[in-house]
Amino acid sequence: LMIKISNLSKSFSGQTVLDHLNLDIQKGEVVALIGSSGAGKSTFLRSLNYLETPDSGSIQIDDFKVDFSQITQEEILTLRRKLSMVFQQFNLFERRTALDNVKEGLVVVKKLSDEEATEIAKEELAKVGLSDREQHYPRHLSGGQKQRVAIARALAMKPDVLLLDEPTSALDPELVGEVERSIANAAKSGQTMVLVSHDMSFVAQVADKVLFLDKGKIIESGTP
C-alpha cells in the first residue's frame, strides 16, 4: 500500500464539500476521479497536498503520516515534496525558459546542484517530447507544450504521487492528445497518480481505478 486517506472532510461556509472520504491507493496505481461539477473532485486533490485546508482527516504515504487537524509547517513541506500537482492553468514562470521552469524546484526545494538539476530537467523534457524547446519561454510555446513542461516539472521532483487536476481542460482539442500521451507514458513507467478528468476515453485508457464522487462522497468505484 502506498497511500491511505482517512476521514477527509472539508466544508466551505457550512456547505460540506468532502464528507469523511476514505481511500487506499496502491503503489503504481492510477486513480481517476469523475463526477459532476462541484462534486468535490478538485477540492479533494488540493486537500491532499494542503493547497486547501481540510477540516479533518489524515493521509499516510508509506511511513509518513499527517493528521490534518494538527499539521506542522515542516509536514506541509514534506507532503508537497511527496505529492506534485499539475493544474489546469500551467502556472509556469513566464520569464524563465522551459528548462529553467523544470529546474527550479530541483534547485530550490531539493537543493541539487545546477549541473544535476539541468541533467534531470533535460531528461524529463525529453520524456514529454520537448528537447527542442528547452530554451523557449512560455510565451513561445503552445498550450499543449506549456502543459507538457508543467508535467515534466512535476515529474522531475520524483514525487511519490502525481496529482493532475483537469490537465487538458484549458487546451484546444487538437492539443489534448499530446498531453494525454505524456501522462499515459508516465503511467506506464509506474508513476502513482490521482487524476481529475472529464475525458472518459482518456480515463478508460490510463486509469486502473475510477471513483465517482457526488456531494463529497465516493458513491461508486470500479475499473474502467
Locations of regions flagged by a protein language model:
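H-loop/switch region of ABC-family ATPase nucleotide-binding domains
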Residues: S197-H198
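Helix N-cap at the start of a conserved alpha-helix in ABC-type nucleotide-binding domains
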Residues: P173-L175
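A short, surface-exposed alpha-helical micro-motif characterized by mixed small hydrophobic
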Residues: V203-Q205
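A short, proline-enriched helix->beta-strand linker immediately N-terminal to the Walker B motif
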Residues: A156-D160
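Conserved ABC ATPase signature
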Residues: Y137-L141, Q145
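Catalytic Walker B motif of ABC-type/P-loop ATPase nucleotide-binding domains
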Residues: L162-D165
